[in-house]
Amino acid sequence: MQSLPETNHLIIKLRSVADTLKEADLRARFFLQLLVRLNPMNLTAKILLALLLLQCKPGLTQEFTIPAISDLPRIDRQSPRPATAILRNSAFILKLKHHAPLGSGYVIITDHTDDPYMAALRELAEYRQAKIIHVADLGKIYQQDVLSAVRKQLIDLKPQYVAIAPRLESYRENMLLGMWELLSTLDDDKYLDAYPGVLLASDAKSFAALIQRSIKFESIAQKQLKPLAISQVPSNQESRSLQKAGILRNVFSSFGIQTPTIAIYTPAADDAPHLSGPQTWNIQMKNKGDFVKKFEPAAATALADASLVIMHGHGSPGMSCSVDIDGILTRSNNQIVLSGSCFAAAPLKTDFPKMTRIPGGYAVTPRQSFSTRYIDRGATVFFGHMRLSSGFPHLYPVLEKWMQGKSVGESYQQLINSLMDMRGLGPGKFVVQEVTPEQRGVPQNILLYVIIGDPALVPLQPLEKINKR
C-alpha cells in the first residue's frame, strides 16, 4: 500500500503539473475525481494515469465553435445555473434590468478645484444645463455625513444623469462603490436611481479635450460605424476570447458591417485555432510577457480607421489583451472602446489588498491604466473594470444597448442594477470597510465596472438588421 507521504507527494505533483496548464483548475478537479473512481487501481497508477492525461494537451483542447448570439443563454438571478462548459467559455449574457431614473435633470459631482478642470466642467454644465455639486474628497463619498449632504441635494435636483468627475487620486474602488450607495438611496428601492458616467483623464489638458469631444460628439450612424475586434489567445486550450471575436463578426455582419479582427497569440498558443477571412491579422508573440507596442502597417491602418474597438482577453494594469498602453495609437478614429480584460480601468491607488498574480499569470505593477491612456489619445467613451472583469457576459449587454441607441448612462445603470440583483448586493453592502490581506475574493468586485464618458452621450444610432430593411 502507498504510504501517506508518498501519496501526498504525488498529489502535489499532479496539482503542480495541472497548474502549468491554462484552465487546469477545472481539469485538475476532473482528474482528481477520476482517481477516486478508479478503485481497482493502486494510487500510484491512478496518479500516473492522471499525469499522462494532463500532459496530453492536444486531446484536451476545447472544441472551438462560434455559436450564434441567439444561442447564448441570458442569465439573471432566477436562471438555472448554466452548464460548466458555458461558464468556462463565458458563453452567456447577463440580462439587464431597466429602472426609471429619479427625474430629468443632469448633475455633475466632483472634487476638482483646479481652474482648468473646473472650466471644462462648467462648459459641460452649460451645454447639458447641469448643476455642479462639489465635495471635498470623492474618495470618501461613502462617509455618512458626506453621503447625507449629497443625497439631499440630489433628491432636490431629481437627476436623470449623474456625471462623476473624481480627481485621479480619489478615483478608487470605494469611491465607485460609495457612488452606488448614494445613487441607490435616492428613493425606497435598492436600485440606482440615475444614469451614471465617469469623467476621468490623466491630466487637465486631456480632461478638457475629453469634455470638448463629448460636447461635439454625434452618435455614430450605421453606415459610418467601423468596428474592430481584438482578442488574446493565451494558450492552445483557452480560445474563448477568440470565440467572442467570431461572435461579434457574425453580429455585425447581420447589420451589413464588416469587423476586422486582430488575434494576438502568446508563445503557449502555438497550435491554437485561427479565424479566417479578409482583414484578419494573427500576431504570434515570441516570448512570454511580450506585449504588442507596435502593430504591423496593415493592422495599424485598420485599427486607426475603427470607430469602435472591442477587446477580449486577459489584462493587467497598463495592458489589455496583450496590447501594451504604448501600443495605443496616438492618432486614430477610436471613439468608443470596450475592454473585457481585468484591470483595464485600474486606479492608481487601491482600497483593496494588493494582488500579486492575476488571471493569465500576469504581475500587478503600478502603471497608467489602459482606460486613461486611451482617453488621453482621443477616445470619448471607454468601458472597463477596476479589477477582475468577467469579460463578454457583462460587456456584450452594454454594447447591445448602445446598438439599440441607448445612452452611456442608461446602459451603465442597467448593468450595475442587474449585477446587484445577481449577487444580492444593495445599500449598506456596497462599500468595503475591511478586507484582510489573505482574503481571496471580494463580492463587491463584480460592481467595479467603469464607463468613462458623458452619461447623456449616445454612442451609436440604433442599428437595423439588413434583412429587416
Regions found by a protein language model. Give the residues of each.
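Intrinsic-disorder-associated, low-complexity terminal segments enriched in Asp/Asn/His/Tyr and depleted
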Residues: 8-9, 19, 25, 39
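Sec-dependent signal peptide recognition
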Residues: 42-49
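Hydrophobic h-region of N-terminal signal peptides that target proteins for export
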Residues: 49-58
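Basic polycationic patches enriched in arginine
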Residues: 15, 27-29, 37
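Short linear segments in intrinsically disordered or otherwise low-structure-confidence regions
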Residues: 2, 13-15, 19
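Cysteine-dependent hydrolase recognition
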Residues: 62-469
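Short hydrophobic targeting helices and cationic amphipathic motifs
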Residues: 9-10, 26, 31-32, 43
